[in-house]
């Protein structure tokens, strides 16, 4: 805690005061000195200039010029250095100790340099926060500081398990590279060979491993060579990968210890050259004869490379970094890089030894050469988790070879072989600064036992079992002089993040080498040790390495503490470790960005001892030891630390607080610490020192880790030993607090590193002239912020110069004296310094990590304030305006300007404290806020959703005001005749009302409008975008939005003209002048009365608790008493009244009030021309009229109070202050909005800190509560200021102390974050098959919130207009709560007939705190009978005293308890219980077989399959008598047709069971087919059924009695993972439709039929019933895997029923569930939350997590507080501040899409609708006259044909049999006979369009007698009572149809009537003017009602239906379900979704 406070003080508080400068002990001396000197110069230089030189503009110019030169120089050098790193041209310099021979250029190297590949795994993007704005991936040198490349994984509430993190693979934020090893130099080879133990006399020597690439033979390969190893530079796999392996998988690999074979790896390109025989282990005798290999032995751990590396800046993709060679090197032939970047690889100093290349993708590790007793080849089993290593494309690499003509410095071993680990495959890229060493070994790291090999195995196992170096003299036959193996090696790393799994990790070479076991696991290890030793007899080694104390340990610990426990980077001065010819020096990030941990000391590498004697001398010297670690994602185990001693009681559980219990943890700086509990609960905390363990075989007990860390020299006093400490990586997502860490006690032997190459980059000074620069990118990023482009650099230099000029200008003006001059210079310095090194994170930054926008905030604000000060001073001196008195205040006087100037001056001086408190937002937020406030309060605009929309909205308002201003000015400048209104003023009034109406109906977001314009003006662009969009599943939302906006524009075209004409007529009359003394008060009283009744009385009577006194609403909806809602909400009379009164209020009363005020004010101005300024008055009248009218149209609930206060204040209280009613009303509207904000803030504060209900979330809350009392006065002042500036008041760390935050717009979150669903459309195939991405409940459940968003988009605006959510306004927040759905809905933009909102869905099963708050908002308080301390009860339907008091002290209230919304009911059944016994599995298999037969018979390709030669030939043996498929997966217990006699599946046994079903299915085909038992059809069915069952058995791994494998296989087949492994089944590949269209849907349908079996076991015994059931399910039910994009499309298209098999992988459960969804109407509780509560809590979370860096997942600010819903609100923040499972994009709902509201007012009015209505009226009159003349004629023949006209709005397909609706429209045709055909109720009265109960799941049995009664259609009956079986045509539109009229009654001239042959009725285009949609038609459900036998013959949907002019609401509700999924017409149906 203390260190975190110090870090916040240093990096947060002090840096905010200085503009970004602070002393960072973790950075280098040069970095800190540079920062300090730059900051001092920026501070002192202007101060000295002002104090020493006389004030003049020349001095200011010199000052600006100096600043510009300095900034230009710094930024140019910074930019050029980054460009230098991007190009990556390296100058290789040899150490002076190396021989001249090494300096000679390589000759004859025919292989050009190749770029070593980097294999990466890209994991899930944790959040959309951009990564740190650096580009460390360009650095050739940066490999260990992986955390700088990774994004800051922000704390997302509860810590996420690392398994979950790995499982949820996403975009490209986290990159873990698993390749990139160093090459060996010759000296290293010698040392390595020298260290190799000689083969014991009894052992047969194995040959060396020659190069396996036949095209590139190794010159050193030969028989009898002991071995020459590959690379020693392998880093263990990232613990992120290791943590993903389960404990069981880890333990399963313990058995793979026996093989001790050297490994030969072949690359992918060699394998292609060699063909199939390429992957062959070499014979032990070196003969080259291939050794047989078992299946699976060539599995590679790493499957591919991502050739693109992540940049920290905007994730750009960069090319590889290229290396340069010394002069005289070979020419880079064949380089695939850009010519300027082409470089040569320096030649290896060792002749003839090809160097080791990087680990490639598709590299196969093959065992070659086992120890004498173990001859079996190695079997590699890859766990499923390793599928996260995904293959991808690559770039061609740089080839590199050592020149063959070079001579070694020392003679090699005679006949010495060489194992070449060379990859020549095309397509590799060196990813600088981002490569983790691959782990090619069985990991020694705890809990990371993957099947990945290490080249150590080949290094140590060639020619025989690899032996460790025993103590001196222990080895036999040391004939070779000892050589030192080159390269520092690594020790096993500590436990990875999942430290639960205690597993024994083993050496990849076999069991002869034992790694030191984990502490606490010795019992498990010893048992394994015996096994390992038995498997490796030739090696006699101790089972566990001995421990040796490190004598110099205190010095190491002291150095750690001196470095602040996390060291800085040592300077790279002196010798470097020479590891290979490809130098990848580690660049240490010397600065840690916002929210990250500080950088530890550089890892300083050395080489191990060259001999055993040296090793012993090294131990005797007691040099400091350190541990090497992989620089991977391991937060929990980033340091190898010891346990403090043998007698320490280490806590095994998190809650062990007994005396002496030691807990290990990592502080915020990544330092591992221990906390020991003492007496009485006390304790003490210590940093854990570095202790290690020396092993007897230290030379071999290290991992290769040569280039994973930065190397730097150490003083000679340390004996040349180098120290290692990796950088800890911030990864809050791991559960590191809950598990005790397993820390092995190990020590690495270090020896003095040999001389190594020194690296420099080419820095081009001039074209052709360059100099060498030794620097690193990460050090540069720690020194200066990176600016990307040239323009950005120019802008930064210009801005710094402007700051200097304006600041010095104010100094010259003499605004500052004494100490304030120095303070002002401090402000100047902070603004300029932030352009070089900004504060990260800033107090106003909305995001973790580096926020580049915030760097420009200070200088921009400074320039604005300086210009404002200068301008105000100039205005005060010049006084260009005459003083104006307004409401008693004198404006534009000299004192006014000077006062404003002084305020701005003081504010500028307070800049350091302003930015420390975060009172100013970042620049783009401030711009959006200012524009939105001006537009809303000045012009009556709606809220903005982005800076672009704010600019567009304000520009639109200014354009309208400019247009109106001319008319107004012209009207009032001319004299008015007595008692007359000029025509120009009437024109102004008409235009004002019409434009206000139009602007109120338009959204501030111009995206949809621009899309419409583009489609008209640039149709080719639209077509191009449509073609791009067709690649993905179609989303109907954009088309619906365009259609809705088009309707609004068409309607406004008519309505604006009508409104303008009517307003002109009313204004031109003298009514406002003649009645001005009386009319005004009449209008005010009428507006007040209507407003009070509409917006206060009605909402209170409809609330759940009216006035918090009554326990039930007075006006209840029809659904209030229903336990379960059965249909759409009925429109009640009070809802109609509410909507009607609102229309009267909006369109009659308030326009009349404004017109009256305008006319009276204009008349007054004209009457007193000397008193008023015409120009100002015209401007005020225009702006005020526009604002008031738009506000009245958009948000009428707030207008009546504003009007009442205006009348009371200026007519009765202060009439002398009145400036005319129009201006009074305008001012009061502005004042009232601020007063409402203040009222909401005070309510929130008082509710939150009320002592009787305070909920302390932490000890700090209890501590801060008393201190909030004296804070109250300041709190009230803050509340006033926050109300004035619309800033949130946020509780500090969730406590009772409130502070003001920075100003925010109504859309108060600044990041445009919304959820991206993970499914099969955005994940790779291999991850889908192996890891099932997105299988967590949150990702799968997010689709229901997405569907809820679409439902709200359809109905929200209409429901608000009907008053179902109570009163509302822009910025309001609501919570929708149901059984499992809990969502926060935020209304952003509220217009006239439109609402823009965002929905944030919370977890279904949230945290404990969330559950408590959900209970609070869902439980009723009616039963409370308490009154203080007693319980006297309460009156009927009245709340008790306690309940009434408690409800008043809440920040939320229930506005509706039964809000009905369409959604999905979710039922899940445990699949295990349904398949537990064999009988149930047999039923499933039987249905599986029958479903396959069904789909075979239904397939249109059946004839093709039966005639296919390949299929026929493959199935011919099946008909041979006695044939049986005896696969072991078939069993009598699960296969009904199992032939016990033949022990398998035979054709006769198959026919005995299924022939009847096959024949029935064939009989239902339209084309006859042979159905005999030996016919091709039966044979094909048999083959497919056998194949399907074998696929299930293969996926299940067996058909054993165990249920888990069976469910696993069933789920694999359900999601489409078919593994055809048997050669007998390969015939299916003749046509993949056999799998896609037969087997795959068969297994899914079988699951549905199996579900139905439980409800009615005997239902499907008859073939007809089964066939019809499958057909019905196929038609009405979507059965799909939840990861399939079709699942999402089906839900969003409102499919009635869906079924899926879900595999739930939680932390504690692994189960399979059958998910069934049924579309129905759900009941929600609508809770209105105080919007200031939401704004304040969100602002508090942002400040706490981002600026104060609180990473505690159980922090007090997210504990439950029922009075404020603290947990639910904070959980709904954007990730990573909160953890919603779904965040919708901003969605606009239009009133026209609400079917019930549309039925009330008849739909939109347009020119087409008017013309249509006129023509239909004429036709009706014409038919009426014709009927009168022709007696006996059928009057209704024409207008009843299919409903005609508007009643034919069905988008259903034509049916084979005429429906009752069809027959009703086609004369008197009788109903066709058939089952299930009872009379049907009329559809015209249905307002919701619910499908009939026939669509419910499970469906009723289809065959059988018809229903006894008509199927009721629920919904409001807005027209006439339904008639049985006849579509009544007596509604307002019924007899106006023009059936059959070309171009009118039908679309495109086709008849509108539905013909008896099943023609699809066409939708009508224009609508009736008055009540064209009063019928509120639902979709025609004739398809659902058709006979089941005909269901399979139903054709597709008519594709022309979407093109019809049907309005959205005309469809009643969402469309009918998707038809057969193969139908191409299923997708156009989605366009009718809304």
UniProtKB/Swiss-Prot annotation:
Biased composition (Basic residues): 391-409
Composition bias type Low complexity, residue spans: 444-460, 1925-1939, 1969-1978
UniProt entry keywords in alphabetical sequence: Glycoprotein, Membrane, Phosphoprotein, Transmembrane, Transmembrane helix
PTM sites of type Phosphoserine: 127, 392, 431, 505, 1025, 1697, 1909, 1955
GO CC annotation, single: membrane
Polar residues: bias regions: 294-303, 427-436, 488-497
Transmembrane region(s): 33-53, 54-74, 790-812, 819-836, 852-872, 880-900, 903-923, 946-968, 980-1000, 1053-1073, 1078-1098, 1244-1264, 1280-1300
Phosphothreonine modified-residue sites: 129, 370
Glycosylation sites: 319, 1770
Membrane-protein topology: Multi-pass membrane protein
Disulfide cysteine pairs (residue numbers): none
Region Disordered: start-end pairs: 96-118, 193-242, 260-517, 540-625, 1844-2034
Skewed-composition ranges (Basic and acidic residues): 305-319
Coiled-coil region list: none
Compartment annotation: Membrane
InterPro entries cross-referenced by the UniProt entry: Pecanex, Pecanex_C
Transmembrane helix keyword on record: yes
Biased composition (Pro residues): 1890-1910
Protein family membership: Belongs to the pecanex family.
Descriptive protein name: Pecanex-like protein 3
Biological source species: Homo sapiens
Lineage: Eukaryota, Metazoa, Chordata, Craniata, Vertebrata
Chain's gene name: PCNX3
């Amino acid at each position: 805690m203390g260190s975190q406070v110090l870090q916040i003080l240093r990096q947060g508080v002090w840096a905010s005061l200085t503009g970004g400068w602070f002393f960072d002990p973790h950075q280098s001396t040069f970095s800190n000195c540079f920062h300090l000197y730059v900051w001092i110069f920026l501070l002192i230089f202007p101060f000295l200039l002002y104090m020493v030189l006389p004030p003049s503009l020349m001095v200011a110019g010199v000052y600006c010029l100096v600043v510009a030169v300095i900034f230009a120089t710094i930024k140019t050098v910074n930019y050029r250095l980054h460009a230098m790193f991007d190009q990556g041209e390296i100058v290789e310099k040899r150490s002076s100790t190396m021989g001249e021979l090494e300096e000679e250029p390589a000759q004859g190297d025919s292989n050009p340099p190749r770029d070593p590949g980097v294999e990466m795994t890209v994991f899930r993007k944790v959040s959309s926060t951009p990564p740190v704005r650096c580009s460390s991936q360009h650095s050739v040198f940066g490999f260990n500081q992986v955390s700088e490349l990774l994004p800051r994984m922000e704390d997302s509430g509860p810590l996420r398990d690392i398994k979950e993190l790995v499982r949820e693979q996403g975009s490209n934020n986290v990159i873990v590279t698993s390749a990139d090893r160093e090459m060996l130099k010759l000296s290293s080879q010698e040392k390595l060979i020298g260290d190799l133990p000689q083969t014991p006399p009894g052992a047969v020597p194995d040959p060396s491993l020659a190069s396996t690439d036949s095209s590139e033979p190794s010159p050193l390969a030969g028989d009898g060579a002991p071995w020459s190893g590959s690379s020693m530079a392998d880093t263990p796999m990232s613990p992120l990968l290791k943590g993903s392996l389960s404990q069981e998988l880890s333990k399963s690999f313990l058995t793979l210890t026996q093989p001790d074979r050297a490994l030969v790896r072949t690359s992918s390109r060699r394998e292609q050259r060699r063909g199939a025989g390429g992957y062959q282990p070499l014979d032990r005798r070196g003969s080259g004869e291939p050794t047989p290999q078992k299946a699976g032995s060539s599995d590679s751990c790493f499957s591919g490379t991502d050739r693109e590396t992540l940049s920290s800046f905007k994730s750009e993709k960069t090319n590889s970094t290229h290396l340069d060679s010394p002069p005289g090197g070979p020419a880079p032939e064949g380089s695939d890089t850009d010519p300027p970047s082409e470089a040569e690889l320096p030649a290896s100093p060792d002749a003839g030894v090809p160097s080791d290349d990087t680990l490639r993708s598709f590299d196969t590790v093959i065992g070659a050469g086992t120890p004498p007793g173990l001859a079996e080849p190695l079997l590699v089993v890859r766990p499923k988790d390793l599928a996260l290593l995904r293959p991808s494309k690559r770039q061609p690499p740089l080839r590199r070879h050592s020149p063959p003509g070079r001579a070694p410095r020392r003679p090699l071993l005679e006949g010495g072989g060489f194992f070449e680990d060379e990859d020549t495959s095309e397509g590799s890229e060196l990813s600088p600064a981002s490569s983790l060493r691959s782990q090619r070994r069985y990991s020694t790291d705890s809990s990371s036992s993957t099947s990945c090999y290490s080249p150590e195995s080949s290094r140590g196992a060639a020619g025989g079992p690899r032996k460790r170096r025993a103590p001196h003299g222990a080895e036999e036959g040391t004939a070779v002089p000892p050589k030192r193996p080159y390269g520092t090696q690594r020790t096993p790393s500590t436990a990875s993040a999942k430290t639960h799994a205690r597993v024994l990790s083993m050496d990849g070479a076999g069991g002869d080498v034992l790694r030191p076991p984990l502490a606490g696991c010795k019992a498990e290890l010893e048992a394994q040790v015996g096994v390992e030793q038995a498997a490796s007899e030739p090696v006699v080694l101790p089972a566990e390495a001995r421990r040796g104390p490190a004598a110099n340990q205190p010095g190491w610990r002291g150095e750690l503490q001196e470095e602040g426990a996390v060291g800085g980077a040592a300077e790279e001065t002196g010798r470097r470790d020479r590891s290979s010819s490809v130098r990848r020096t580690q660049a240490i990030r010397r600065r840690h960005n916002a929210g990250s941990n500080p950088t530890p000391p550089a890892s300083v590498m050395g080489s191990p001892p060259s001999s055993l004697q040296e090793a012993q001398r090294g131990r005797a010297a007691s040099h400091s030891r350190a541990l090497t670690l992989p620089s991977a994602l391991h937060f929990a185990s980033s340091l190898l630390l010891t346990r403090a001693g043998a007698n320490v009681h280490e806590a095994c559980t998190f809650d062990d607080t007994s005396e002496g219990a030691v807990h290990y943890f990592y502080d915020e700086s990544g330092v591992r610490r221990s906390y020991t509990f003492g007496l009485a609960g006390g304790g003490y905390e210590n940093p854990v020192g570095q202790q290690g363990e020396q092993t007897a075989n230290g030379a071999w007990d290290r991992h290769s880790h040569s280039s994973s860390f930065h190397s730097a020299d150490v003083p000679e006093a340390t004996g040349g030993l180098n120290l290692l400490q990796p950088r800890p990586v911030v990864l809050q997502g791991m559960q590191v607090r809950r598990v005790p860490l397993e820390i092995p006690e190990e020590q690495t032997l270090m020896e003095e590193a040999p001389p190594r190459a020194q690296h420099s980059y080419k820095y081009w000074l001039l074209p052709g002239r360059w100099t060498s620069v030794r620097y690193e990118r990460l050090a540069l990023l720690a020194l200066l912020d990176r600016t990307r482009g040239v323009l950005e650099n120019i802008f930064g230099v210009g801005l710094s110069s402007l700051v200097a000029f304006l600041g010095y200008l104010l100094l010259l003006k003499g605004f500052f004296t004494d100490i304030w001059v120095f303070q002002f210079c401090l402000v100047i310095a902070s603004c300029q310094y932030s352009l070089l090194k900004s504060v990260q994170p800033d107090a106003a930054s909305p995001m973790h990590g580096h926020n580049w926008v915030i760097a420009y905030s200070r200088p921009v604000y400074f320039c604005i304030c300086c210009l404002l000060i200068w301008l105000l001073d100039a205005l005060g001196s010049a006084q260009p305006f005459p003083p104006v008195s307004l409401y008693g205040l004198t404006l534009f006087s000299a004192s006014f300007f000077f006062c404003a100037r002084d305020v701005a001056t003081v504010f500028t001086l307070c800049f350091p404290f302003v930015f420390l408190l975060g009172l100013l937002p970042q620049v783009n937020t401030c711009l959006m806020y200012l524009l939105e406030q001006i537009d809303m309060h000045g012009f009556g605009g709606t809220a903005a959703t982005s800076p672009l929309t704010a600019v567009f909205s304000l520009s639109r308002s200014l354009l309208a005001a400019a247009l109106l201003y001319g008319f107004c000015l012209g009207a009032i400048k001319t004299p008015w005749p007595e008692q007359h209104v000029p025509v120009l003023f009437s024109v102004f009034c008409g235009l004002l009302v019409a434009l206000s109406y139009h602007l109120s109906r338009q959204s501030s977001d111009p995206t949809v409008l621009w899309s419409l314009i583009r489609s008209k003006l640039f149709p080719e662009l639209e077509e191009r975008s449509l073609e791009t969009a067709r690649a993905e599943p179609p989303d109907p939302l954009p088309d619906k939005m365009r259609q809705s906006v088009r309707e609004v524009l068409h309607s406004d075209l008519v309505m604006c003209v009508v409104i303008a004409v009517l307003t002109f007529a009313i204004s031109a009359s003298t009514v406002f002048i003649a009645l001005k003394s009386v009319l005004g008060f009449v209008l005010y009283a009428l507006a007040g009365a209507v407003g009070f009744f509409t917006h206060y009385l009605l909402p209170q009577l409809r609330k759940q608790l009216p006035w918090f006194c009554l326990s039930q609403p007075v006006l209840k909806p029809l659904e209030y008493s229903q336990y379960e809602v059965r249909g759409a909400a009925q429109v009640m009379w009070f809802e109609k009244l509410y909507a009607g009164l609102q229309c009267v209020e909006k369109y009659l009363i308030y326009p009349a009030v404004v017109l009256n005020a305008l006319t009276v004010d204009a008349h007054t101005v004209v009457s007193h021309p000397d008193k008023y300024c015409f120009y100002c008055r015209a401007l005020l009248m225009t702006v005020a009229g526009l604002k008031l009218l738009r506000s009245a149209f958009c948000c009428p609930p707030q207008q009546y109070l504003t009007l009442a206060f205006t009348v009371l204040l200026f007519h009765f209280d202060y009439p002398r202050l009145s400036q005319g009613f129009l201006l009074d009303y305008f001012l009061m509207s502005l004042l009232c909005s601020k007063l409402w904000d203040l009222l909401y803030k005070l309510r929130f504060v008082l509710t939150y800190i009320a002592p009787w209900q305070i909920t302390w979330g932490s000890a700090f809350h209890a501590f801060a509560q008393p201190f909030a009392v004296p804070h109250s006065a300041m709190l009230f002042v803050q509340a006033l200021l926050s109300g004035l500036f619309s800033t949130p008041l946020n509780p500090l760390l969730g406590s009772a102390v409130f502070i003001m935050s920075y100003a925010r717009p109504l859309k108060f979150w600044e990041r445009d974050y919304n959820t991206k669903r993970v499914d099969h459309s955005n994940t790779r195939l291999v991850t889908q098959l192996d890891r099932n991405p997105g299988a967590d409940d949150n990702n799968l459940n997010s689709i229901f919130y997405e569907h809820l968003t679409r439902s709200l988009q359809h109905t929200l605006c209409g429901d608000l207009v009907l008053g179902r959510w109570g009163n509302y306004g822009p910025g309001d927040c609501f919570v929708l709560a149901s059984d499992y759905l809990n969502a926060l809905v935020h209304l952003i933009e509220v217009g006239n007939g439109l609402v823009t909102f965002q929905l944030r869905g919370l977890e279904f099963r949230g945290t404990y705190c969330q559950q408590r708050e959900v209970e609070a908002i869902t439980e009723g308080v009616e039963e409370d009978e308490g009154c203080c301390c007693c319980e006297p009860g309460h009156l009927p339907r009245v709340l008790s005293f306690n309940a009434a008091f408690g409800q008043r002290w809440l920040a939320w209230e229930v506005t509706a308890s039964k809000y009905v919304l369409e959604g999905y009911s979710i039922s899940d059944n445990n699949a295990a219980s349904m398949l537990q016994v064999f009988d149930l599995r047999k039923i499933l298999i039987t249905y599986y077989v029958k479903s396959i037969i069904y789909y075979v018979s239904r397939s249109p390709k059946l004839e093709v399959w039966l005639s296919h030669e390949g299929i026929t030939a493959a199935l011919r043996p099946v008909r041979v008598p006695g044939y049986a498929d005896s696969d072991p997966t078939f069993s009598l217990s699960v296969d009904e047709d199992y032939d016990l006699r033949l022990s398998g599946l035979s054709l006769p046994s198959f026919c005995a069971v299924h022939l009847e079903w096959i024949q029935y299915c064939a009989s239902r085909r339209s084309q006859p087919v042979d159905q005999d038992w030996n016919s091709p059809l039966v044979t094909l069915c048999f083959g497919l059924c056998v194949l399907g069952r074998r696929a299930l058995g293969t996926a299940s791994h067996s058909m054993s009695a165990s249920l888990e494998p069976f469910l696993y296989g069933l789920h694999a087949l359900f999601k489409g993972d078919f593994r055809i492994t048997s050669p007998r089944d390969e015939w299916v590949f003749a046509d993949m439709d056999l799998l896609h269209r037969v087997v795959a849907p068969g297994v899914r349908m079988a699951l549905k039929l199996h579900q139905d079996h439980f409800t009615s076991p005997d239902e499907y015994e008859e073939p007809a019933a089964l066939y019809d059931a499958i057909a019905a399910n196929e038609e009405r039910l979507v059965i799909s895997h939840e990861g399939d994009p079709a699942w999402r499309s089906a839900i969003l298209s409102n499919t009635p029923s869906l079924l899926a098999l879900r595999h739930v992988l939680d932390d504690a459960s692994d189960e399979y569930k059958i998910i069934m969804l049924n579309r129905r109407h759900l009941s929600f509780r609508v809770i209105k939350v105080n919007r200031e509560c939401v704004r304040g809590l969100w602002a508090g979370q942002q400040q706490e997590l981002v600026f104060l860096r609180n990473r505690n997942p159980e922090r007090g600010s997210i504990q439950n507080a029922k009075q404020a819903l603290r947990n639910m609100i904070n959980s709904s923040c954007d990730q990573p501040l909160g953890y919603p499972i779904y965040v919708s994009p901003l969605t606009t709902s239009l009133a026209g899409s609400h079917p019930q509201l549309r039925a009330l007012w008849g739909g939109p009015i347009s020119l087409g609708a008017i013309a249509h209505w006129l023509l239909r009226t004429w036709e009706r009159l014409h038919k009426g006259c014709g009927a009168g003349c022709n007696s006996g004629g059928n009057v209704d023949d024409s207008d009843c044909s299919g409903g005609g006209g508007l009643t034919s709005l069905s988008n259903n397909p034509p049916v084979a049999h005429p429906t009752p609706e069809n027959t009703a429209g086609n004369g008197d045709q009788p109903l066709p006979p058939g089952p299930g055909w009872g009379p049907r109720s009329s559809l015209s009265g249905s307002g919701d369009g619910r499908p009939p109960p026939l669509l419910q799941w499970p469906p009723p049995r289809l065959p059988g007698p018809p229903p006894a009664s008509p199927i009721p259609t629920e919904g409001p009956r807005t027209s006439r009572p339904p008639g049985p079986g006849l579509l009544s045509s007596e509604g307002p539109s019924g007899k106006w149809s023009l059936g059959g009229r070309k171009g009118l009654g039908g679309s495109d001239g086709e008849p509108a009537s539905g013909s008896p042959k099943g023609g699809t009725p066409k939708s009508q285009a224009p609508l009736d003017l008055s009540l064209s949609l009063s019928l509120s038609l639902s979709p025609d459900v004739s398809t659902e009602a058709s006979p089941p036998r005909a269901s399979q013959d139903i054709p597709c949907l008519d594709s022309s239906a979407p093109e019809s002019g049907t309005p959205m609401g005309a469809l009643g509700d969402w469309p009918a379900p998707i038809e057969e999924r193969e139908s191409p017409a299923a997708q156009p149906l989605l366009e009718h979704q809304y």
